[in-house]
Amino acid sequence: MRKRLLVVLGLVLAMVATLQTGAQAKLPTSGGVCVEHDVGAGFEGRGTRVRDLVEAPKKDPVAKWVRRHGNQADRAADRADRGQAITVPVWFHVIRKDATVAGGNVPASRINAQMQVLNDSFTGSTGGASTGFRFELQGITRTTNKGWFNLTGGGKDRKIKQALHRGGLETLNIYTAKLGANLLGYAYLASDAEEVGVLDGVVVHFETLPGGAFSIYSEGDTATHEVGHWFDLYHTFDGGCDGGDFVDDTAPEASPAFNCPVGRDTCVGGGVDPITNFMDYTQDSCMFEFTRGQAVRMQQAWSAFRA
């Protein structure tokens, strides 16, 4: 097993009393964690579960593949530039404790709304670059299990996915549940997908889907952020001002941005912080874009690890 196990534990939430920046929840010691929003009075952060939260791996698997497969890499970049559509099959797995909405029984209308958010975000309809990906819902499974609904540990995650996972590396499995440890969501990177097998996929708190109860984080962008990780994107702030997201056209950012701090500039040179990027930690209404460089990386990661 490679030492670089990148579980993108999206959206670990820092429980705080206000919507201002502050201390973040303690991160797990094994693996790194994608820090996301708080489910208390306000949320902070939105992140990745990588080996280290603040330091992306120095050896990029996507770049390694690009060096070895130049022609395929060029074709992947061309797809991104043309917005040529690759359709990703999606399975939604609803984990609920009972038949009520409060018990996690997310209605089909909210799942369809989440699918629309994903398609709008990745096709550039919200104002960013078109990534060349679209998503097509294949089906919805519903599982009533009180123990699984409170998804608090890795053992449950494995059991759930072993029972419910559908398709291969090219299939996006999205699981909804009530996450513990102040989490909004998590995912595995494309470059780890083959190694982790059925664990591959995206998990989000059911209240983050459009129409959920998480206030400024209930427009569906938690899933967008985590699917970005599923395509092997890192946070815009990974590596700080040195840049560690392996994308040239995202401005350097010293630390995660919260809320929507317009004009924030934490690094000298390179422009203002990319607070509107889906791979930062800002609130849903603030983020609306991927960059062309991120689109190219996603296409290359797809060709390398999922196609």
What is the predicted function of each stretch?
Residues 1-25:
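Secretory targeting and sorting signals
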Residues 26-171, 178-180, 303-307:
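Propeptide-to-catalytic entry region of secreted or membrane-anchored zinc metalloproteases
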Residues 88-94, 134-137, 171-176, 200-206, ...:
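Structural recognition of the beta-strand scaffold that forms the well-ordered cores
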Residues 98-108, 212-217, 285-286:
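Second-shell loop/turn segments in exported
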Residues 112-115, 119, 201, 221-224, ...:
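Extracytoplasmic/secreted envelope proteins and their assembly/folding machinery
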Residues 162-235:
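Active-site-proximal segment of zinc-dependent metalloprotease catalytic domains
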Residues 216-288:
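The catalytic-center signature of Zn2+-dependent metalloproteases
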Residues 288-307:
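Pan-zinc metallopeptidase signature
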